[in-house]
Amino acid sequence: MNKLDSMNEIVEEVVKRIQQQQQNTFEVEASGRHVHLSRQEIDALFGPGYQLTKVKDLSQPGQFVCKERITVAGPKGLFQNVVILGPERSESQVEVSMTDTRILGINAPVRESGKTEGTPGVTLMNGSAVVTLSHGLIVAKRHIHMTPEDALKNKVSNSQIVQVKVEGTRPLIFDDVVVRISPRFATYMHIDYDEANACGLTKGARGYILK
């Protein structure tokens, strides 16, 4: 094999790999600030036994937007009409962007959902009802919800960290993206509004994992 043949093989392999990556694309969604509430906080904010009102399903099976809204407050500022996502959880959690943390005046860490140990608290308000969480404020780590079938196609494992190229008006490669695999999931990548603005995200935008 001469040098030209060898180069052609390398080029063909690279092209094949890129084509395979682009075939395994998934939709990228932007998540705005939102709250997950436990039964304890629901009772405190809305009254004992109150049931959250579902108004719209989300892309992840079983998760939904609630009609109810609350205020999230920090030492420097607050956000009104913050959406609550259901169903209720075992522990309350508030997810915001980096920009939001500066407005609130609270230095929240980047964490995976549910990993709230050692995170700062924040105040939740609904009218005269006020609850101050001891912890639970996070900036959500960018992540991909993935079915086991799509994980096989993409050759990734649960909790693996990958790079993702997001196509759009400002194409961008996101590093440090965690893959979360479950048969309960639908395959979508989630980023926050800061990240969405950085890549000029539009509805229906897609991304793919880089190897």
Swiss-Prot record:
Swiss-Prot/TrEMBL cofactor(s): Zn(2+)
Subcellular location: Cytoplasm
GO MF annotations in UniProt: acyltransferase activity, transferring groups other than amino-acyl groups; metal ion binding
Primary enzyme class: transferase
Annotated pathway: Polyol metabolism; 1,2-propanediol degradation
Ranges annotated as spanning the membrane: none
Protein EC: 2.3.1.222
GO biological process per UniProt: propanediol catabolic process
Cofactor descriptive note: There are 2 Zn(2+) ions per monomer; Zn(2+) and CoA bind inbetween the 2 domains in each monomer.
Keywords associated with the record: Acyltransferase, Cytoplasm, Metal-binding, Transferase, Zinc
Domain notes: Formed by 2 beta-barrels, each is capped on both ends by short alpha-helices.
Entry's family note: Belongs to the PduL family.
Protein name: Phosphate propanoyltransferase
Organism: Enterococcus faecalis (strain ATCC 700802 / V583)
